[in-house]
From Swiss-Prot:
It comes from the Bacteria. Belongs to the long-chain O-acyltransferase family. Catalyzes the terminal and only committed step in triacylglycerol synthesis by using diacylglycerol and fatty acyl CoA as substrates. Required for storage lipid synthesis. Disulfide bonds: none annotated. GO terms for biological process: biological process involved in interaction with host; glycerol metabolic process; glycerolipid biosynthetic process; response to hypoxia; response to nitric oxide; triglyceride biosynthetic process. Induction: A member of the dormancy regulon. Induced in response to reduced oxygen tension (hypoxia), low levels of nitric oxide (NO) and carbon monoxide (CO). It is hoped that this regulon will give insight into the latent, or dormant phase of infection. Also induced when grown at pH 5.0 for 3 weeks. Pfam families: WS_DGAT_C, WS_DGAT_cat. This is Probable diacyglycerol O-acyltransferase tgs1. The keyword Cytoplasm does not apply. The active site is at H137. Signal peptide: none annotated. Its EC number is 2.3.1.20.
Amino acid sequence: MNHLTTLDAGFLKAEDVDRHVSLAIGALAVIEGPAPDQEAFLSSLAQRLRPCTRFGQRLRLRPFDLGAPKWVDDPDFDLGRHVWRIALPRPGNEDQLFELIADLMARRLDRGRPLWEVWVIEGLADSKWAILTKLHHCMADGIAATHLLAGLSDESMSDSFASNIHTTMQSQSASVRRGGFRVNPSEALTASTAVMAGIVRAAKGASEIAAGVLSPAASSLNGPISDLRRYSAAKVPLADVEQVCRKFDVTINDVALAAITESYRNVLIQRGERPRFDSLRTLVPVSTRSNSALSKTDNRVSLMLPNLPVDQENPLQRLRIVHSRLTRAKAGGQRQFGNTLMAIANRLPFPMTAWAVGLLMRLPQRGVVTVATNVPGPRRPLQIMGRRVLDLYPVSPIAMQLRTSVAMLSYADDLYFGILADYDVVADAGQLARGIEDAVARLVAISKRRKVTRRRGALSLVV
């Protein structure tokens, strides 16, 4: 597809509406040394980028949004304009690295060129170096971006991700439309009932999403943002998370969100704010990407808006409430409504949807406090130019009054959390990261001392 979908174009519109927003997603790879020289790196990168034409294309915009932006080949494409090199004062530590990442992610990508950058970062302690890869969100969602980035490694990792992407289920209504008259009336009745049930769920989901967005949240973590950022990160062993999953029959995503909930609860308390039921309404993206669409560079997501239980003091109760609310949200109609809305929007004339999206972006959104996105990453360690990738940190942007975002990515034997925050209002981004690690450790300790017998639950990294 050469034209942006309504969702893809919405990420551009969010930047147009708020000059403080930079909607790039990123991945920070920390790599064993020594760093290659620039010529060798450019040569290797050029070879690996060749299969994906999107890296050599820029957007052609239509005046007054008369048509959807279109990807076109950039006749002036120069790899050297997309690959930059920078060094920390030796020996650079983690805090200095994260400060640099925050600064680089705050800078907008140039729309006159292909919408991506690679930063080679030298000067890390122990002869390590790093690569920050930035892609505009209109170009890819988290899953597509992760597969693109893994493709830059020394070997194809397409079969090595932490979990299979759920195959998007085909609507039963489609089979009714294609099938014409059915011989078996009971089958037609079953299909019609399923369609009506889907419509009812989608309508309920629409009301839930509207209520979530329009109801003001009691939190200082929602409001206008500046053009400066802070970045911090947490890292926990996947084996520890899986132990909690097995003990309490929950998913990896449940444990991760419960840890995030505890960390936000502590931050709110230290700010002198009372954690309430609606203090942490969270946008949780849900992938609708099928396995056959992994190579597509676009956005294929729906959403859920659960209230994470920051008002709950007990860690185990908090975990169980997170599990319960996510289970209900998955079974409810929020995802269905999101899918239906995007399908309808993509069939309407683009000027109409662009105007509607622009109007919605300008409304003061006070109901949602943060975004928490979870992407399955490579199960096996990657190598870049013969050097091991030691750590892989995700970065997701902030926008629409959300002053923090949390991105989660599994890599090899660990689960990584990347926190991007507004510089002026969220000085405690590092505390959020440490709080996540402490919360996971607390759940692990509880799982070791509690004697409960439960069946083994499925472990999944995709909501």
